[in-house]
């Protein structure tokens, strides 16, 4: 997965353009907290950031792109603790619980990004891969040296499925973290 993701989200931007994107994302974060995911628009974010709508759409061509960029920013700023635990099962469970807590703490972002990542917006394709690569890397790190790629992929698929169920309201993100404990233990049985 990571081989498909080679360029950072702001590759090719000069310092001023990167600063504009950062202002837009900071404004989007504030706007999301105040109005929620349903009411958030690229235009309202542009207004809050003090840039024209045309400028905002240059960097964030769609609402889905905005949510995906916000979520990737959230993942990168999250700074998870180093995976701790006596064994790979405990370390992966710590990773899934941390991610679930992070989503539970940002329900509006979780709601917006769920729809964005499930959509067919081509502007989100690269970000979808980068987000998935972030999950894969966290699982790989928790498993340690020599992690079986099939196990890593299975964990990523299980986590994605749990995200989908939580995003559909079938469980809370907190419940997702709890339920993934059993899933992780089952997947890793015999592989650690």
Predicted segments with their positions:
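Short secondary-structure transition hinges
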Residues: 101-143, 164, 168-169
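Helix-turn-helix
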Residues: 23, 27, 31-65, 69
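Amphipathic alpha-helical packing segments from all-alpha helical-bundle domains
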Residues: 120-157, 175-185
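Amphipathic alpha-helical interaction segments
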Residues: 23, 44, 65, 94, ...
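N-terminal intrinsically disordered/low-complexity leader segments
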Residues: 1-19, 30, 192
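Short, basic, alpha-helical segments at the C-terminal edge of helix-turn-helix-like DNA-binding modules
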Residues: 72-78
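C-terminal peripheral helix-coil segments that are non-catalytic and often amphipathic
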Residues: 1-7, 101, 137-145, 168-192
């Amino acid at each position: 997965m990571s081989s498909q993701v080679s360029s950072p989200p702001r590759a090719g931007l000069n310092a001023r353009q990167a600063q504009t994107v950062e202002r837009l994302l900071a404004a989007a974060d504030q706007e999301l907290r105040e109005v929620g995911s349903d009411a958030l628009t690229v235009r309202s974010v542009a207004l809050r950031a003090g840039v024209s709508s045309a400028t905002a759409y240059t960097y964030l061509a769609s609402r889905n792109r905005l949510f995906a960029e916000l979520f990737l920013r959230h993942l990168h700023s999250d700074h998870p603790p180093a995976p701790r635990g006596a064994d790979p099962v405990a370390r992966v469970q710590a990773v899934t619980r941390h991610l679930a807590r992070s989503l539970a703490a940002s329900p509006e972002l979780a709601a917006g990004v769920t729809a964005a990542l499930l959509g067919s917006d081509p502007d989100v394709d690269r970000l979808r891969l980068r987000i998935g690569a972030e999950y894969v890397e966290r699982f790989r790190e928790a498993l340690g040296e020599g992690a079986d790629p099939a196990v890593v992929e299975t964990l990523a698929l299980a986590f994605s499925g749990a995200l989908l169920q939580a995003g559909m309201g079938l469980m809370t993100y907190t419940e997702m973290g709890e339920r993934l404990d059993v899933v992780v233990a089952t997947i890793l049985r015999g592989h650690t």
